[in-house]
UniProtKB/Swiss-Prot annotation:
Family that this chain belongs to: Belongs to the MnmG family.
Binding of FAD, residues: G13, G14, G15, H16, A17, G18, V125, S180, Q370
One GO-annotated biological process of the protein: tRNA wobble uridine modification
Compartments where found: Cytoplasm
The protein, known as: tRNA uridine 5-carboxymethylaminomethyl modification enzyme MnmG
Phylogenetic placement of the source organism: Bacteria, Pseudomonadati, Pseudomonadota, Gammaproteobacteria, Enterobacterales
Pfam family, one: SAM_GIDA_C
SUPFAM superfamilies noted in UniProt: FAD/NAD(P)-binding domain
Cofactors: FAD
């Protein structure tokens, strides 16, 4: 039977991608349905209890700048906040927070249940309704059919999921949850390229059985960082430390002596695992010269005794897991409350997607999250928001939107996936971005919130706060530009105490702030340049914009030069055999990838600068040289 009301957008899956997709589509005014196999696990952290990190924190800030949910949720659930790379330049600084799993899940569910235009329904989806290469709905396990103009698949590791502990395995979407086998079979019938990936998680430890007195503590930062541009530290719950232990030669001997019982090394697991979050078996074998590896003992919550040992993800048998855990300092009497495991699952080649994350072959069908070959909550959330907003735009008969690589880490993520694809779980790093000085955490709102407002993602409260911040930045910069001090002035003596070389000529506040030894806080503590802005976010922007002005201007020039060709469009129907002068290898790769632009084509392995020049000349001769807006 059909459900009585049609929807504009259906989201299948309630993880980090699905919840952002649902919120985005609903915020844009579209009637949205979120289908999940279990309402109680909406926003569940399936692996590590943390949000953010290098590259990942940048994505969270961008999701927040576009009105998303993740940053707000972690501000309400974070039990330890830190700035990573704090001593380095602003481009690579990143926020990370330990999370209370229960509080995080509660924050996500509360937001979803209070979002207008959004209905949540508990039923596993087993089929899609596809008519003439267009998706028009979904069918649940009890045969209930829902119609919609667009469907977003955010099913994580559930598609034909198989859990491995030692040489034993069983079907599962994650520990304690069933897999999605009928939907996996249905998707394999569609003209989509599918393969298998693998990820894993460590055993969870009972905190009462760990001797923390012999371990080093790791505390959060003070003052506490905040994730959301709309948040403040008063929202944070109680803060707690993490602890650090290490593997040792005994640990490594246990692992080496039991490799024949590892499903990965025994050839039972075929899927490729994440390069940058390897299992402890992989670390011991790949880095044989290391006699220890650092392990972070992270609390799972304020009301839980479970500890997440970050760094010992494993699929070895349970008895071996016990030996590994008890070989480490402070863990000699530790008890495991949940075994570690590996999970294999289906993923679909993201090269079959448009930059909007819509399928190139099934109109109205969008993919987001681990189903696209990524790993991590943050990568999933960013894709979910993009897929949700584009599903909403499609249902409203509007053109899709995707950020450029020079505009957002989300743009880098999507371009990498859709252009290059991936053969292993993809993780975001700042090193993946060519223009990372422009793509900082601190300016995510300056880059994206105005666009978010145009798209209908940003509400009035966020828009008002954003404009107030812009005004504060502009007003303060003008004040510093117009406030001067001369070497002979009485205030010069106070200024000189903060300078490595005393003033020799008249200087404005901005001139002084450009000096490497002068911070904004120091400058505004001086009588001549007081008071400091109360708006801490605006104050940070003033300091960064002034200190890095020359570097930022230079990178902006590089971006503009690159964009002249980057945005030159390539016809979707172009057969590259028509372009004389291209090698057979280049023709094959371009016909296989079908890049949407010259920029995408230039990032395909094997497509040379000479081939790009030939393409540009050919497009010009054919009168097909046009650029996207």
């Amino acid at each position: 039977m059909f459900y009585q009301d049609p929807f504009d957008v259906i989201i299948i899956g309630g993880g980090h991608a699905g919840t952002e997709a649902a919120m985005a589509a609903a915020r844009m005014g579209q009637q949205t349905l979120l289908l999940t196999h279990n309402i109680d696990t909406l926003g569940q952290m399936s692996c590590n209890p943390a949000i953010g990190g290098i590259g990942k924190g940048h994505l969270v800030k961008e999701v927040d700048a576009l009105g998303g949910l993740m940053a707000k949720a972690i501000d309400q659930a974070g039990i330890q906040f830190r700035i990573l790379n704090a001593s380095k330049g602003p481009a690579v600084r990143a926020t990370r927070a330990q999370a209370d799993r229960v509080l995080y899940r509660q924050a996500v569910r509360t937001a979803l249940e209070n979002q207008p235009n959004l209905m949540i329904f508990q039923q596993a989806v087993e089929d899609l309704i596809v008519e003439n290469d267009r998706v028009v709905g979904a069918v649940t396990q009890m045969g209930l059919k829902f119609r919609a103009k667009a469907v977003v698949l955010t099913v994580g590791t559930f598609l034909d999921g198989k859990i491995h502990i030692g040489l034993d395995n069983y079907s599962g979407g994650r520990a304690g949850d069933p897999p999605s086998i009928p939907l996996s079979r249905r998707l394999r019938e569609l003209p989509l390229r599918v393969s298998r990936l693998k990820t894993g998680t460590p055993p969870r430890i009972d905190a009462r059985t760990i001797d923390f007195s012999v371990l080093a503590q790791q505390h959060g930062d003070n003052p506490m960082p905040v994730f959301s541009f709309m948040g403040n530290a008063s929202q944070h719950p109680q803060q707690v430390p993490c602890y650090i232990t290490h593997t040792n030669e005994k640990t490594h001997d246990v692992i080496r002596n039991n490799l024949d019982r590892s499903p990965m090394y025994a050839g039972v697991i075929e899927g490729i695992g994440p390069r940058y979050c390897p299992s402890i078996e992989d670390k011991v074998m790949r880095f044989a010269d290391r006699n220890q590896h650092q392990i972070f003992l992270e609390p799972e919550g304020l009301t839980s005794n479970e500890i997440y040992p970050n760094g010992i993800s494993t699929s070895l048998p349970f008895d071996v897991q016990m030996q590994i855990v008890r070989s480490m300092q402070g863990m000699e009497n530790a008890k495991i409350v949940r075994p570690g495991y590996a999970i294999e699952y289906d993923f679909f080649d993201p090269r079959d997607l448009k930059p909007t994350l819509e399928s190139k072959f099934i109109h109205g069908l969008f993919f987001a999250g681990q189903i696209n070959g990524t790993t991590g909550y943050e990568e999933a959330a960013a894709q979910g928001l993009l897929a949700g907003l584009n599903a909403a735009r499609l249902s409203a008969d509007k053109e899709g939107w995707a950020p450029a690589r020079s505009q957002a880490y989300l743009g880098v993520l999507v371009d990498d996936l859709c252009t290059l694809g991936t053969k292993e779980p993809y993780r975001m790093f700042t090193s993946r971005a060519e223009y990372r000085l422009m793509l900082r955490e601190d300016n995510a709102d300056l880059r994206l919130t105005e666009m978010g407002r145009e798209l209908g993602l940003v509400d009035d409260e966020r828009w008002a706060r954003f404009n107030e911040k812009l005004e504060n930045i502009e007003r303060e910069r003008q004040r510093l530009k117009s406030t001067w001090v001369t070497p002979s002035a009485e205030s010069a003596d106070e200024v000189n105490t903060h300078l490595t070389t005393p003033l020799s000529r008249e200087a404005s506040g901005e001139d002084l702030l450009r000096r490497p030894e002068m911070t904004y806080a120091q400058l505004t503590s001086l009588a001549a340049f007081a008071p400091a802005l109360e708006d801490e976010q605006a104050a940070e922007q003033v300091e960064i914009q002034v200190k890095y002005e020359g570097y930022i201007a230079r990178q902006q020039d590089e971006i503009e030069k690159q964009l002249r060709n980057e945005n030159t469009l390539l016809p979707a129907t172009l057969d590259y055999r028509q372009v004389s002068g291209l090698s057979n290898e280049v023709i094959a790769k371009l016909n296989d990838h079908k890049p949407a632009s010259i920029g995408q084509a230039s990032r395909i392995s094997g497509v040379t600068p000479a081939a790009i020049s030939i393409l540009l000349v050919w497009l010009k001769k054919q009168g097909m040289l046009r650029r996207s807006a």
